[in-house]
UniProtKB/Swiss-Prot annotation:
Binding-site list for 7,8-didemethyl-8-hydroxy-5-deazariboflavin: D49
InterPro entries: CofD, CofD-like_dom_sf, FbiA/CofD
Cofactor entry: Mg(2+)
Source lineage: Archaea, Methanobacteriati, Methanobacteriota, Stenosarchaea group, Methanomicrobia
EC number: 2.7.8.28
Protein name stated in the entry: 2-phospho-L-lactate transferase
Subunit structure: Homodimer.
General function of this protein: Catalyzes the transfer of the 2-phospholactate moiety from (2S)-lactyl-2-diphospho-5'-guanosine to 7,8-didemethyl-8-hydroxy-5-deazariboflavin (FO) with the formation of oxidized coenzyme F420-0 and GMP.
Keywords for this protein: Magnesium, Transferase
Entry superkingdom: Archaea
Phosphoprotein among keywords: no
Length: 297
């Protein structure tokens, strides 16, 4: 079994390539929940949903979020009633959020809810929230602290930030299922997701770093030069006082990583790194990258 640590954009592209080489049942994905948010009566787990929709064959791969071909009737009406609405959520996607919220209110864990949703959509891959406890990512601005979703979706990252914080300010416990997925893995792959808001929250869960220290870990940088392939990783890395490039990512992951992969076009020099084509513009490129990664096992 191969276990991935994933956020919601870069790593799912790699997972798309992995599916062409491995049975879904041989893949486990530990997913960031630091960006989860209660919103308009639903509970959104954006990264969990992206991974789940991918394996269900439902993901809109034009945007890498939401359901392919979804309608937006509810969103259109809500915009007239609640003009401050800043998330464009499709109707089928919203139904998942509402169901998740109802189950959580009834006392189900996020892990159990995710299992139930995966069963409903016929997903055989093991998709695991990093924790059943809240660990929400906020950013600090001149006007106060705001949820990461508001920073990235409402403001498109166009506001200065001076800190990245988490609520509550204590390590969340990794679930037993997460620990088990790491222990059973032949290799753990840290995908090319945002290092600060997608991967660090997973690494912050109690027990995760200790388990990874016993495993072979391969990490893929999301940077090419001084910019990430997508998302606000550059500004977030600078806020964390790390270089906004692959050298910063390597330093952030420190001694957890056995093999560090960066793009063949990357101008940043990381000693000992493996150079591959990591710009996954097509499923074929993602599959080729995954094939190259598997040769490093």
């Amino acid at each position: 079994m191969i276990t991935f640590l994933s956020g919601g954009t870069g790593t799912p592209k790699l997972l798309e390539g992995a599916r062409n080489m491995l049975p879904d049942s041989d893949i486990s994905v530990i997913v960031n929940t630091g960006e989860d948010i209660w919103y308009q009566g639903g509970h959104i787990s954006p990264d969990v949903d992206t991974v789940m929709y991918l394996f269900a064959g439902l993901l809109n791969t034009d945007t890498w979020w939401g359901v392919r071909g979804d309608s937006f009737l509810t969103h259109d009406v809500l915009k007239t009633l609640l003009p401050a609405s800043y998330m464009s959520i499709g109707d089928k996607d919203r139904a998942v959020h509402i169901a998740r919220a109802e189950w959580l209110k009834k006392g189900m864990t996020l892990t159990r809810v995710t299992q139930q949703l995966c069963s409903h959509f016929g997903v055989s891959t093991t998709i695991l929230p990093m924790s059943d406890s809240p660990y929400t990512t906020y950013v600090r601005t001149a006007k106060g602290d705001i949820h990461f979703q508001e920073y990235w979706v409402r403001y498109r990252g166009n506001t200065d930030i001076c800190a990245v914080l988490h609520v509550p300010d204590e390590q969340p416990p990794a679930t037993p299922e997460v620990i088990d997925a790491i222990r059973k893995a032949e290799v753990v792959i840290i995908g090319p997701s945002n290092p600060v808001t997608s991967i660090l929250p997973i690494l912050s869960c109690t027990g995760v770093r200790e388990e990874l220290a016993q495993k072979k870990v391969i990490a893929i940088s999301p940077f090419i030069g001084e910019g990430p392939v997508s998302g606000p990783a550059a500004q977030l890395m600078k806020t964390m006082k790390y270089p906004a490039d692959s050298t910063g990512v390597r330093a952030l992951y420190a001694d957890l990583v056995d093999v560090f992969i960066q793009d063949e076009r990357d101008t940043a020099q990381v000693p000992g790194s493996v150079r591959l084509d990591t710009l996954m513009k097509t499923p074929a490129i993602a599959e080729r990258l995954m094939r190259e990664i598997l040769t490093r096992l």
